[in-house]
Amino acid sequence: MGAQEIIRSIEAEYTKSDLPTIYVGDTVKVGVRIQEGGKERVQPYEGVVIANSGGGINESITVRRIFQGVGVERVFLLHSPAVASVQVLRRGRVRRAKLYYLRDRVGKATRVKQRFDRSI
């Protein structure tokens, strides 16, 4: 057994199998586990996926949303234990792999057209 196979077998234990297929431009709701005091709760974070990177256990998405007039971006490792759930709310129609140009846009210009040919 080579080193790559050993790494894959260890990673297979930690990968989540219930994740939906996420594309750039999709609007998603990510449930993030937060520890406050001795309690744990799940906080939803909703926004547009502007970047998708990595593969396997290192797969991550960058989600952007506008909060109180300020753009906020968070990077989520999809297979992390801190990510409780990922739900696709709507599919977006875009022609780019990275939507970094949305950072320079304000108001209604940041909207992404909806895509109807992919199921949610």
Curated annotation (Swiss-Prot):
Keywords, ordered alphabetically: Ribonucleoprotein, Ribosomal protein
Domain of life of the organism encoding this protein: Bacteria
One cellular component term from this protein's GO annotations in UniProt: cytosolic large ribosomal subunit
InterPro entries registered for this protein in UniProt: Ribosomal_bL19 (IPR001857), Ribosomal_bL19_CS (IPR018257), Ribosomal_bL19_sf (IPR038657), Translation_prot_SH3-like_sf (IPR008991)
Acyltransferase recorded as keyword: no
Transmembrane segment boundaries: none
A Pfam family per the record: Ribosomal_L19
NCBIfam families reported for this sequence: rplS_bact (TIGR01024)
Family matches, as HAMAP family: Ribosomal_bL19 (MF_00402)
Function: This protein is located at the 30S-50S ribosomal subunit interface and may play a role in the structure and function of the aminoacyl-tRNA binding site.
Database matches in PANTHER family: LARGE RIBOSOMAL SUBUNIT PROTEIN BL19M, RIBOSOMAL PROTEIN L19
Name of the protein described by the UniProt record: Large ribosomal subunit protein bL19
Protein source organism: Synechococcus elongatus (strain ATCC 33912 / PCC 7942 / FACHB-805) (Anacystis nidulans R2)
Gene name of the record: rplS
